[in-house]
Design a protein with these regions (language model features):
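Polytopic transmembrane helical bundles with strong interfacial aromatic enrichment
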Residues: 22-180
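Short, Lys/Arg-enriched N-terminal segments with co-localized hydrophobic residues
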Residues: 11-26
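Basic polycationic patches enriched in arginine
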Residues: 2-6, 14
Length: 180
C-alpha cells in the first residue's frame, strides 16, 4: 500500500500564491495606475486597427468588432483615470520627480481620456445604427475611427509624459535642474 506524501514545496508554493494575492490587495493607487495605464493606449490602438480594417475591407463583422473594441477601451480607460490623482499624490514628493511633469501628464491624460470616451460614445451609437440597419452607420463608424485615432495619439503622448515622471532617461536632456 502506497502512502501519499505531500510535496514539501507545495506549502511554499501555496504560501507564495497567498502572498501574491495579499500583495495585490494591498497595492496603492500608484501600483494600480502603473498596471492599468497601458490598457487604454494599447486598447485604443488595437480598436482603431480593427475598426480601420473593417471599414477598408467593408466587412460589417470586423467593423462591429472594432466598434465593440473602441467601447471596451473606453470602459477600460476608467481605472487609469480614477487612479491617476492618487498616484500623483504618492510620487510628487519623491526625489527627481517634477510637479510640472505630473501636471503636464495629468492634463494630457485628461484630454486623451475624454477623446477616448467620445470615441466610445460614437461607437455605441454606431452599433445601435448597425442594429437598426441605418445607412448612416458606416459614416458614424468612420467618424468613430477618426476620434479613436485622435484618442490613441493623445493617450500615447500622455503615456510618454507619464513615463518621464520616474524615468529620467527618456526626458529631453535627461532632466534639467529646474525639474529636480
Amino acid at each position: 500500500m502506497r502512502t501519499s506524501r505531500r510535496d514539501p514545496g507545495s506549502f511554499v508554493k501555496r504560501a507564495a500564491s497567498h502572498e501574491s494575492i495579499l500583495h495585490f490587495l494591498l497595492m496603492n493607487q500608484a501600483h494600480i495606475h502603473l498596471i492599468v495605464n497601458h490598457v487604454p493606449i494599447l486598447g485604443s490602438l488595437f480598436a482603431l486597427l480593427l475598426l480601420g480594417a473593417g471599414l477598408v475591407m467593408r466587412s460589417e463583422i470586423l467593423t462591429k468588432a472594432g466598434l465593440v473594441a473602441v467601447l471596451a477601451a473606453g470602459l477600460l480607460c476608467l481605472p487609469a483615470q480614477l487612479t491617476g490623482e492618487g498616484a500623483a499624490e504618492i510620487v510628487q514628493d519623491m526625489p527627481r520627480v517634477s510637479r510640472a511633469l505630473i501636471q503636464n501628464h495629468a492634463a494630457a491624460a485628461e484630454k486623451g481620456f475624454w477623446a477616448l470616451e467620445s470615441a466610445a460614445a460614437l461607437a455605441l451609437f454606431s452599433l445601435l445604427l448597425f442594429k437598426s440597419a441605418s445607412p448612416r452607420a458606416r459614416l458614424l463608424a468612420l467618424l468613430t475611427l477618426v476620434v479613436a485615432t485622435l484618442s490613441f495619439g493623445l493617450l500615447a503622448r500622455a503615456g510618454n509624459l507619464g513615463g518621464q515622471i520616474r524615468h529620467t532617461e527618456i526626458r529631453d536632456g535627461f532632466g534639467t535642474p529646474d525639474e529636480l
